């Protein structure tokens, strides 16, 4: 069922106010040196639940491999990206202290940008190679501290519902850190909010499928393309895109 005009306005108000609140909260915790990662995790999951409840979404998680986060090993979640709702769905469905690798432009948004940085999200500069390398070095450090990095290997949301071409950055990071890649396929998130619209659809059901982890430490730099292909095939299957 499509949301009415008033419901759309309400969803937008709740989204903006709850997002501003958690950004200010995390920023305050940083300023007062009382930041706690586990508490930040719980706040992000609370925020995600609020957004999903407002659109009446339900979700089912399939984890046939019983994926867990191995202490002492870097982890990268690589997921298809069809909707803004992939982010809250990931927070409520996937294991670990998840943070996103996001384009630098988002960090320039007042309050939101400061909140993301305070909560240990990582920016990536898509247009400046030297800065991108510095960003990836920062990502390596934060992964070593226990953060599970969420990456959309396409680099952006799909407007067609199909996987686009993969970018190399996330895979280079996985190879450099010997990370465990957790492939994830999200089915149905685009039906909640179609691309480039505010036409919310209420009561949709989404599937979050967690695949078999891929150990990037078993690959070398010359095998990068093989690693990319393996992960791509996994995500295609999990996202229901198998040919």
What are these regions (language model features)?
Residues 1-30, 42, 67-69, 222-243:
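Membrane-interfacial terminal anchoring regions of lipid-handling membrane enzymes
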Residues 2-6, 133-243:
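Non-catalytic C-terminal accessory region of glycerolipid acyltransferases
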Residues 19-22, 26-34, 38-42, 53-54, ...:
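Catalytic core of membrane glycerolipid acyltransferases/transacylases, capturing the structured
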Residues 48-57:
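A generic, lipid-embedded transmembrane alpha helix
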Residues 49, 88, 171-172:
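Active-site phosphate/pyrophosphate- and oxyanion-stabilizing loops and adjacent acidic/basic residues
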Residues 56-58, 97, 118, 146, ...:
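A generic structural signal for alpha->beta connector loops
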Residues 61, 77, 100-101, 208-210:
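Generic preference for hydrophobic
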Residues 65-71, 138-141:
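Short amphipathic alpha-helix with an adjacent loop that forms part of the alpha/beta core around
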């Amino acid at each position: 069922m499509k949301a009415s005009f008033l419901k759309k306005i309400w969803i937008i108000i709740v989204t903006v106010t709850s997002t501003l609140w958690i950004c200010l909260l995390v920023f305050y915790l940083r300023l007062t040196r009382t930041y706690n990662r586990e508490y930040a995790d719980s706040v992000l999951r609370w925020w995600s639940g609020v957004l999903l409840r407002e659109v009446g979404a339900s979700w089912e998680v399939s984890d046939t491999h019983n994926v867990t986060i191995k202490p002492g090993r870097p982890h990268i979640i690589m997921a298809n990206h069809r909707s803004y709702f992939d982010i809250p769905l990931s927070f409520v469905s996937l294991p670990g202290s998840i943070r996103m690798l996001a384009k630098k432009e988002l960090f320039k948004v007042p309050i939101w940008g400061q909140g993301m940085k305070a909560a240990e999200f990582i920016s990536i500069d898509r247009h400046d190679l030297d800065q991108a390398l510095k960003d990836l070095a920062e990502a390596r450090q934060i992964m070593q501290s226990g953060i599970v990095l969420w990456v959309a290997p396409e680099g952006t949301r799909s407007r067609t519902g199909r996987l686009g071409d993969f970018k190399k950055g996330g895979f280079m990071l996985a190879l450099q850190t010997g990370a465990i890649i957790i492939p994830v396929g999200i089915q149905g998130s685009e039906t909640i909010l179609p691309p480039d619209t505010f036409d919310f659809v209420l009561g949709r059901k989404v599937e979050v499928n967690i695949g078999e982890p891929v150990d990037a430490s078993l690959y070398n730099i010359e095998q990068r393309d093989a690693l990319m292909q393996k992960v791509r095939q996994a995500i295609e299957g999990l996202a229901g895109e198998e040919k």
